[in-house]
Amino acid sequence: MSAAGFPSTMTSIAPPAVSGSEAKPVSRTPETYLGSLRGSGPAGTSARPANGAWTLDGRWTIADEYAVPETTGVLTFGFDARDVFLVIEPEAGGGTIEVLVDGKPAADTADVRAGVIAPAESRMYHLVRLAAAGPHVLRLTVKGRLRLFAFTFG
């Protein structure tokens, strides 16, 4: 530093501490595919699946790239992250998803309102935004024909 004209006693300044929505996302859950080609498949029928594991209730079709309920189905997922995203594609007629985190309606995000999402196009949807990462259980009650492709976390 002294070569640049700064005193040799000068030290670097640490960035300010941040928390809440400004904090860097931390995820301990890997990206998870729900289709049969890249996914590991559902992990039984537990109401509290382990981190990264998921279960299905109801009649579902697991296609190569996605999972889709026949009419109404429940997907339960264990995760350890602050943010949860899901790629969704509505089929004809669409549908809605009730989003619960630890048994309570998910807080509003850009896509979720009052714990419900109504996907209108094929894209990645922001389902969950928490104050901090931690172990949680996500429960999605899917009503209608919605293709669920992959979860990502932040």
Residue ranges: model-predicted function:
Residues M1-G154:
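Non-globular targeting/processing and membrane-anchoring segments
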